[in-house]
C-alpha cells in the first residue's frame, strides 16, 4: 500500500494554474509582446487602444459629451475593418430610425440628401446596415432580456458586439415597481 501511495500521480487541483501550465504562452509573450488587438481605424485612438473579443468595454464621461456617438463610430470602424456585426440595446437612442440614420451616415461617410434616396449608393448602404446592425427594441430593458436577445443574435445573425447604451437604463432584474 505504501508503494502505491508513493507512486500515485497527484490529481491536479481544480481552478489552479501553475507557471509550467502557461510557460509556452509566457515565452511567446516575452519574445513577441502583446498581440495586436482589433482597432477602429482612427489613427490617434488606435495608437492608445485596441481590443480583443470577449472583453467588456465601458465608456464613461459627462452627460451629452458624445459617448454614444463615439461608440457608434467605434462599431462602424470594427465593422469596416473586420466585418463585425453589432446589436444595440439603446433605450436613449429612440426612436430607432434616428439611431439607424446616425449609423447610416457613418457608413455613408457623409449626410445623404433627399436626392440620394434609392440611388445605388443608398441601396448599398441600406443593405449593409440592414445585415450588420441590429436594434433591440423592448418595452422594458432588463439585463437578462438584453443578454438573451444578444445570444439569439449571435446564433441567428452572427453578431460580435452587443452595445448596451446607456447601461444604467437597463435594470438588473425585472422590477415592476417603478
Outline where the language-model segments fall.
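The Walker A/P-loop phosphate-binding site
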Residues: 11-109
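Cytosolic-facing regulatory segments adjacent to core modules
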Residues: 46-47, 81-158, 172
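Structural motif
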Residues: 58, 135, 160-163
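Residue-level preference for long, well-ordered alpha-helices that form the structural scaffold
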Residues: 67, 122, 177-178
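Helical hairpin unit composed of two closely spaced alpha helices linked by a short loop
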Residues: 159-178
Amino acid at each position: 500500500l505504501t508503494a502505491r501511495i508513493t507512486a500515485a500521480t497527484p490529481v491536479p487541483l481544480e481552478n489552479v494554474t501553475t507557471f509550467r501550465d502557461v510557460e509556452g504562452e509566457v515565452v511567446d509573450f516575452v519574445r513577441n509582446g502583446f498581440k495586436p488587438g482589433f482597432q477602429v481605424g482612427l489613427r490617434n485612438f488606435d495608437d492608445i487602444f485596441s481590443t480583443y473579443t470577449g472583453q467588456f468595454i465601458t465608456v464613461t464621461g459627462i452627460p451629452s459629451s458624445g459617448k454614444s456617438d463615439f461608440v457608434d463610430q467605434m462599431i462602424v470602424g470594427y465593422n469596416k475593418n473586420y466585418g463585425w456585426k453589432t446589436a444595440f440595446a439603446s433605450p436613449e437612442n429612440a426612436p430607432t430610425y434616428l439611431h439607424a440614420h446616425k449609423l447610416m451616415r457613418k457608413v455613408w461617410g457623409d449626410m445623404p440628401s433627399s436626392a440620394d434616396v434609392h440611388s445605388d449608393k443608398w441601396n448599398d448602404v441600406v443593405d449593409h446596415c440592414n445585415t450588420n446592425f441590429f436594434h433591440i427594441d423592448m418595452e422594458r430593458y432588463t439585463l437578462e432580456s438584453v443578454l438573451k436577445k444578444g445570444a439569439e443574435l449571435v446564433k441567428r445573425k452572427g453578431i460580435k458586439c452587443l452595445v448596451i447604451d446607456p447601461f444604467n437604463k437597463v435594470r438588473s432584474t425585472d422590477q415592476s415597481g417603478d
